[in-house]
Regions:
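GHKL-family ATPase ATP-binding module
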Residues: 1-99, 132-134, 141
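A short acidic, often aromatic-flanked loop/helix-cap motif at beta-alpha or helix-coil junctions
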Residues: 101-103
Length: 185
């Protein structure tokens, strides 16, 4: 117990005197942790790319994927309307269950555990921690299709936040769009 108390007392003094070293060690530990999380995310993302997404209405075009559009819809009722109105050759769709999570307040582990985001990434061919190459994606256009109400606006904002946080190059390329649904009274 004497050695333990001596070490604790002197280690505390040393750490207070040498704050630069302490901060450096903490920064490196955080950096290693973030790198490991991105590495795990990349591995899980590559695995997810090979998965079949149950709720995906896929486009039938296989060769010219640059012509394909994915509609991310608010709920099963919206996807039902899309199912009958879409051009099956070039248009696909996936329905969200409720509001997606806010990635600004989440860590990578939570995002990867979120089934909605995992399905979206697998449907498009995106991987967290890797830039999006339009030529490699299953859909080169992504359209958010939500109701014209407060919830729909919030869903569009959360989806925009998700894509812009991890793949801002999709916005630069003009691949992300928001459909303005008509308002019925």
């Amino acid at each position: 117990k004497g050695i333990e108390s001596f070490m604790a007392k002197n280690a505390d003094k040393w750490l207070r005197k040498n704050k630069g070293y302490t901060e450096l060690v903490l920064e490196r530990a955080k950096s290693r942790h973030k790198f490991q999380m991105l590495k795990d995310a990349s591995k899980k993302g590559r695995k997810a790319k090979r998965q079949r997404v149950e709720k995906l209405l896929d486009a039938n075009e296989r060769r010219r994927r640059e012509l394909c559009t994915l509609f991310i819809c608010e709920g099963d009722s919206a996807i039902g309307g899309l199912r009958s109105a879409r051009n099956k050759l070039y248009q696909g769709g996936i329905a969200l269950k409720g509001k997606p999570m806010n990635v600004a307040q989440s860590n990578i582990k939570d995002i990867l555990a979120n089934q909605e985001f995992t399905n979206i990434m697998a449907s498009i061919g995106l991987t967290l921690g890797q830039p999006a190459e339009l030529s490699d994606l299953r859909f080169s256009n992504i359209v958010f299709l939500a109701d014209s109400d407060v919830d729909g606006g919030h869903i569009n904002t959360l989806l925009t936040n998700f894509f812009f946080t991890f793949w801002p190059e999709l916005f630069v390329a003009g691949a992300i769009q928001i459909a303005k649904a008509p308002l019925y009274e």
